[in-house]
Swiss-Prot record:
Keywords in alphabetical order: DNA-directed RNA polymerase, Nucleotidyltransferase, Transcription, Transferase
Source organism per UniProt: Nitrosospira multiformis (strain ATCC 25196 / NCIMB 11849 / C 71)
Protein name: DNA-directed RNA polymerase subunit alpha
Function: DNA-dependent RNA polymerase catalyzes the transcription of DNA into RNA using the four ribonucleoside triphosphates as substrates.
Gene: rpoA
SUPFAM superfamilies cross-referenced by the UniProt entry: C-terminal domain of RNA polymerase alpha subunit, Insert subdomain of RNA polymerase alpha subunit, RBP11-like subunits of RNA polymerase
Reactions this protein catalyses: RNA(n) + a ribonucleoside 5'-triphosphate = RNA(n+1) + diphosphate
Length: 334
């Protein structure tokens, strides 16, 4: 199908308001495409961007989240809330086990976390806890890569065998803090009914706004390519099972070795196979021209010798591959 040429954006302006905040303007779009693409990109940015978050923690001396630690101003619940606010990024791996150990009076921050050269703490000044004189805080923090928001109660089902004292955290993986879009009017030459799309994106520093919208656009293109190609894996279609038919019924009536008279009478009634014959009743056969009681008795005796009778019912007769037009006249009377 041929279609008219659609306008594509020729002007893309990126205004960096801050390292974490950008306003991206794209124009022109055909009328209505601003809302169509803006809403799709916004939903992908908010729900499908990969990021990193603390998912599990073990604190020395803590058995459950409602415990309290001597020498620490915050209770465990507050410490866990502060851990969720840590923004970090792993390079070349998808999960890591980090350690945080500090003692003595002072403030514990995200910058005190140790995890190796491939762990980048985006907000090292983020406060985790405050220690008083003689206070001590030791913990291990598991960080994982993921998408969206995953409550700890959901992850708990898959961690039934976790160690005593291990606390699962609600994980917010999305590196995008806020996304909004607006559609304004655009003009190209004499056309004034076009759209200008303005997207306002703010991230937490794991990705910059430009990288985020590129990733979202890539996801959208990959998803829509399925519709463009109409390719995929079709659902398996279960083939209907053909009913089993006794091979004897598929044999021609000539195999019954009837007299020539009886055989010709049957063929005159389009009875070519044994399966055709056993479905006829005695009354029906006696109506056949030139077939009398003697021939009928002969047919009944031959069928009985094979464990068959007249008047039987076959639900799946005739089979689709049966040649009903087959006629064998080798025994026909001259």
């Amino acid at each position: 199908m041929q279609s008219n040429t659609f306008l594509t954006p020729r002007i893309i302006d990126v205004q960096n308001i801050s390292p974490l905040h950008a306003r991206i303007t794209m124009e022109p779009f055909e009328r209505g495409y601003g809302h169509t693409l803006g809403n799709a990109l916004r939903r992908i940015l908010l729900s499908s961007m990969p990021g990193f978050a603390p998912t599990e923690v073990q604190i020395s001396g803590v058995v459950h989240e409602y415990s309290a630690l001597d020498g620490v101003q915050e209770d465990v619940v507050d410490i866990l809330l502060n851990l969720k606010g840590i923004v970090l990024k792993l390079h070349n791996r998808t999960e890591a086990l980090l350690t945080l150990s500090k003692k003595g009076e002072g403030t514990v921050t995200a910058g005190d976390i140790e995890g190796g050269h491939d762990v980048e703490i985006i907000n090292p000044d983020h406060v985790v806890a405050h220690l008083t004189s003689g206070g001590k805080l030791d913990m291990q923090i598991k960080v994982e890569m993921g998408r969206g928001y995953v409550p700890g109660t959901v992850r708990q089902l898959a961690h039934e065998s976790r160690a005593i004292g291990s606390i699962l955290l609600d994980a917010s993986f999305s590196p995008v803090r806020r996304v909004s879009y607006a559609v304004e009017s655009a003009r190209v030459e004499q056309r004034t009914d076009l759209d200008k799309l303005v997207m306002d994106i703010e991230t937490n520093g794991v990705v910059d706004p430009e990288e985020a919208i590129r990733y979202a656009a890539k996801v959208l293109v990959e998803q829509l390519s399925v519709f463009a190609d109409l390719k995929g894996t079709p659902l398996p279609v279960e083939q209907p099972k053909l009913p089993q038919i006794d091979p004897v019924l598929l044999r021609p009536v000539d195999d019954l070795e009837l007299t020539v008279r009886s055989a010709n009478c049957l063929k005159a009634e389009n009875i070519y196979y044994i399966g055709d014959l056993i479905q006829r009743t005695e009354t029906e056969l006696l109506k056949t021209p030139n077939l009398g009681r003697k021939s009928l008795n002969e047919i009944k005796e031959v069928l009985a010798s094979r464990g068959l009778t007249l008047g039987m019912k076959l639900e799946s007769w005739p089979p689709s591959n049966l040649d009903k037009g087959k006629k064998d006249t080798s025994h026909a009377a001259p």
